[in-house]
């Protein structure tokens, strides 16, 4: 028996050594979590429900200084040393510009239906307006054509943080009313050029982040705020930028509906980020704080789009610092979506912070809330790599249900959802992402509950297919379900990718 045990130990040690030397792609069978769909399957969702992945041009394309692309505000923003960890850039990132076929093939192999990508404005119009860059047009035609060939439905987003630098230098971009016509012209060109194949459009991704992170705290390009080196005014500029973003969205939708929608037979919407804000307690003050947070976060954009006006709470607090819509603008903005994308990752507790600051200092200060991440010593959820990302599955149910009940149950797509690992994990560590599998399984289960209760959600997009350039975090954060070796750019599907493959190929509930 002792000889048998010794031989068994030796065999197990040899097997373990072999597995450690194998490419990660050969080791997926080791993780039983891949095969636990938790009762989820395609048939568990309404007929026609779409599963896809999402990404943005700046984060995945590369070729930032090639192919005729003009610089964006992000190219200028990250030039300052220390802005991005290790002074990283998106000049190459994961090079989807050249590797798009490989990436689309991965999507197809994993069973996904669609890819939500973004078009780089400055790759089409290097100066924001005027001369078209045909190389850029050709690239997007190749990408779209290959998706269609492989049966991957293209969901095109027109703007994901990357304003052409020329427009910022000319008139400060989103702070000028001139931007509205410029964006509408760019959108018009895209509808005309790609709309014969693209039937699902979004105007903006997370315009709240554009306004708040770009003009309130300067954390994102163009880095403006009160006290920022780039200048700015945190009490007014976020609201002005948001106002022009909303008008630009509505102007683009107007062009689409008047000129293209009837014969192209597509639909158009907007992508809004939404953290769920849970009252810290049942007190009226904490409940009011949570509602203010929802108004200042989601309502800032969805109230005008649904009702043609800003939330009453914002009008009361911001007062004359809040821009106003003319009657004509209000009519143009109201009902300017066929569907709405909700990007959801996490949830926070909200509590009343006490006396109001009577002197406005910033958009964030106008919320007048206190953030909390634990209650009675219990964290709201486990923390992912990003400091802001707590894993709170029930929050997605509450967020979607809130949109259903507050805004008349519009047609929704859960357009981003995911979690990150540290950027420095090895390939072997990175591909075995059990925590991410559990994140997706639990969040999608909660989403399904909201759908079963009547929420009109017609699709779900995981963020993201690939590890990529994660804005201010650079390459220190990995959101992908496919690991990318940034030295070789080789792709390694993670366990979570194979979990999706198993779940999406399931014919019935487990």
From Swiss-Prot:
Q: Provide the glycosylation site positions.
A: 87, 127, 233, 424
Instruction: Name the SUPFAM superfamilies for this protein.
Output: (Trans)glycosidases
Q: What class of enzyme is it?
A: hydrolase
Some GO term, biological process aspect, for this entry: which one?
Answer: carbohydrate metabolic process
Q: Which UniProt keywords apply?
A: Disulfide bond, Glycoprotein, Glycosidase, Hydrolase, Signal
Q: Which reaction does it catalyse?
A: Hydrolysis of terminal, non-reducing beta-D-glucosyl residues with release of beta-D-glucose
Superkingdom of the organism of origin: Eukaryota
> Which family does this protein fall into?
Belongs to the glycosyl hydrolase 1 family.
| Its biological purpose | Hydrolyzes p-nitrophenyl beta-D-glucoside, p-nitrophenyl beta-D-mannoside, p-nitrophenyl beta-D-galactoside, p-nitrophenyl beta-D-xyloside, p-nitrophenyl beta-D-fucoside, p-nitrophenyl beta-L-arabinoside, cello-oligosaccharides, laminari-oligosaccharides and sophorose.
Keyword Zinc-finger belongs to the record: no
Disulfide bridges in this chain: 225-228
Q: What is this protein called?
A: Beta-glucosidase 26
Species of origin: Oryza sativa subsp. japonica
According to its UniProt record, the EC number is 3.2.1.21
Q: Which Pfam families match?
A: Glyco_hydro_1
- The residues that the entry says bind a beta-D-glucoside are 59, 160, 205-206, 345, 416, 463, 470-471, 479
